[in-house]
Amino acid sequence: MATNEETNLRLEVQEWINHDPDPETSNELLESLSKDDWPALQERFSQRLTFGTAGIRGTQGSGPNRMNRLTIRRVASGIAEYIGQGATVVIGHDARKNSKVYAEDFATLLSNHDVHSLIFSSPVPTPVVSFTIREKSLDLGVMVTASHNPATDNGCKIF
């Protein structure tokens, strides 16, 4: 019989799965649920990644304590609300796994909020995003990268 804590966690995980656009991370959670792997689920849902001085970054995987497509979409939604309709944002990405997908998701979310974006089609170094903001007098810049973190991590910097 499931405890109240397990029931609440199961509901939270299911809610995450319902919004997760990535089958890989959704399946990761479904597998943990099917195995009743509460320690793994608790670790992924006991806290959320938070912004530090250099942006937000962490290990890639499922849940709010990992970098993934849903985490990126939530960050993009918050940024869109902050800068408002009609703003223009430049988005760059590095060559890490999922960086291009995260950048494209970011641009899509901004567009859904009537925020314009310029997105680099191939990987660029972080300073290129910073330069482009000033050169083109843009409102904001986003660089999808985990910077000096391990290659398995990802994240984004906001300028």
Put a short name on every predicted segment:
Residues A2-F106, H113:
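An N-terminal, well-structured beta->alpha segment
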